[in-house]
């Protein structure tokens, strides 16, 4: 028998907690015998004293086990259960292509995704731009669609990692969000409760990333790989660039449109293709569906080009309540804004930098994201046909197309983009994918 305040005192004094102490505290969080004040104090002691790797693993497992942990064994999928998670960015629509691509190669991807957070877009918000798409199916339907389509992307249910919900809500209002131990446990407790065999973590770097520096992103990636493997789930991470919008679009319906066009081979943004392929290839190698990265990439290009990946996406949409003919008639189903016109730079010159975070906030300001949890989303608004870093902005080459509801909204968005995209000065190229981090690299 432990006392929450004694566990807090021990951590406050810089000592390492045992797995039993951490389990006791997190069970108390889940059953409400630990108060919000105690959660806040616990989070702050971790913020100042950090956790050892065994403590991080114990915290992650305790939060994972605070609710239901899905067991897929009765489904007899007949292939590896794999998933990926991204720390989030702007125009990061990779999940919508990645799930079907891996499914078409023989993997099973039961993906539990989130909504937009701050400046980052949410996979669920994008999918809800598809009429009828149900992000909260029963567990039976979730499993059935995963089995039939190879992929199902849904929202977090209340019975997965409930302790994380309480801890996160308290961290959000006590300035303890940006701590590697707490971020690691929060991300992984939800993901590992979904019954995965392996996981690929896409950690973003740059002006639109969650972590402020390359070093912080690398530290988070290493923590996630070490903790997830320690908790029994094979995991690797990739560090990818978020110094500019990843896709050619940012918003909800505009990103779904780009994802469908990507899967059908109508248009594939080269950066989006590279980052998506990097994550998918890791998933195939981890799931033993490919010998190595080269083999994986060849298989992935094949399912993109022969239409099998697009077919898996269509099956998922139909299985979760969306239109059965969505892939053929997607443009008729996705909401469109009344005003779609370009914005130009105020001067001609090379695009040398993007404040990607500010571009994400411009989407939110238009109604394409939430300022508070109760806000509703306008699926039609956003941007597409983005200029890339290193390209020349001119009277012929706009910064982007703005999808707005009215002229005033268009003007506000135009001002935001002109301020966020720097024209002129030195442009230093950055790689799309910086590096992979595997267990043996730590």
Curated annotation (Swiss-Prot):
SMART domains on file: PYNP_C (SM00941)
Keyword Glycosyltransferase attached: yes
MF (Gene Ontology): 1,4-alpha-oligoglucan phosphorylase activity; thymidine phosphorylase activity
Major enzyme class: transferase
Domain of life according to the entry: Bacteria
Listed Gene3D superfamilies: Nucleoside phosphorylase/phosphoribosyltransferase catalytic domain (3.40.1030.10), Pyrimidine nucleoside phosphorylase-like, C-terminal domain (3.90.1170.30), Transferase, Pyrimidine Nucleoside Phosphorylase, Chain C (1.20.970.10)
A GO biological process held by the record: pyrimidine nucleobase metabolic process
Metabolic or biological pathway, per its Swiss-Prot or TrEMBL entry: Pyrimidine metabolism; dTMP biosynthesis via salvage pathway; dTMP from thymine: step 1/2
Positions of transmembrane segments: none
Listed EC numbers: 2.4.2.4
Entry keyword Transferase: yes
Matching InterPro entries: Glycosyl_Trfase_fam3 (IPR000312), Glycosyl_Trfase_fam3_N_dom (IPR017459), Glycosyl_Trfase_fam3_N_dom_sf (IPR036320), Nuc_phospho_transferase (IPR035902), PYNP-like_C_sf (IPR036566), PYNP_C (IPR013102), Pyrmidine_PPas_bac/euk (IPR018090), Pyrmidine_PPase_CS (IPR017872)
Xref: PROSITE patterns: THYMID_PHOSPHORYLASE
Keywords: Glycosyltransferase, Transferase
Reactions accelerated catalytically: thymidine + phosphate = 2-deoxy-alpha-D-ribose 1-phosphate + thymine
One of the record's GO cellular component terms: cytosol
Record note on quaternary structure: Homodimer.
Assigned protein family: Belongs to the thymidine/pyrimidine-nucleoside phosphorylase family.
Cited function: The enzymes which catalyze the reversible phosphorolysis of pyrimidine nucleosides are involved in the degradation of these compounds and in their utilization as carbon and energy sources, or in the rescue of pyrimidine bases for nucleotide synthesis.
Protein name, entry field: Thymidine phosphorylase
Species name: Vibrio vulnificus (strain YJ016)
Gene: deoA
